[in-house]
Regions:
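Acidic ATP/Mg2+-coordinating residue in the GHKL
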Residues: 73
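Conserved micro-motifs of the catalytic ATP-binding
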Residues: 29-32
Length: 150
């Protein structure tokens, strides 16, 4: 997972924006279609760049039998009552009305995460903007009758 995140960070960083990182050390193994996850992360970063004020952070980690990656920004954020609707195609938050966009970015992210048996959450970032976190299952195999994460 971190290798895919690193590729997106490298591609999306540049003279227009710098991306802070908080990637868990070491490998995070998940079953994924790398191009799809790249598309999801890129959509999340573009969303953060479009609606934020310049600060973007991409992080990853694991918790129990799940891995996660997230993108945070320092924009106006999304009101809690609007969050559940943002994953629907063509729906945009109130703070997005003054900027260009189709309202498809988070719907595409939701579809990709769903296709990976994952879960998508919206919250507030450490700087008051939007935090989008995707949870993906960590594969488990049986070894000597015991379950073990790979």
């Amino acid at each position: 997972l971190n290798a895919v995140l690193g590729e997106v960070i490298a591609a999306e960083s540049g003279y227009e924006r710098e991306i802070d990182t908080g990637l868990q050390e070491g490998e995070i193994i998940v079953r994924m279609h790398p191009l799809s996850i790249k598309r999801a992360v890129a959509n999340m970063v573009v969303n953060a760049a479009r609606y934020g004020n310049g600060w973007i952070k991409v992080s990853s980690g694991t918790e129990l039998n799940r891995a996660w990656f997230q993108v945070e920004d320092d924009g106006p954020g999304i009101q809690p009552e609007q969050r559940e609707h943002l994953f629907q195609p063509f729906v945009r938050g109130d703070s997005a009305r003054s900027t260009s966009g189709t309202g498809l970015g988070l719907a595409i992210v939701q579809r990709i995460v769903d296709n990976h048996n994952g879960l998508l959450e919206l919250g507030t970032s450490e700087r008051g903007g939007l935090c989008i976190r995707a949870w993906l299952p960590i594969p488990v195999v049986r070894q000597n009758g015991q379950l073990k994460e790979v």
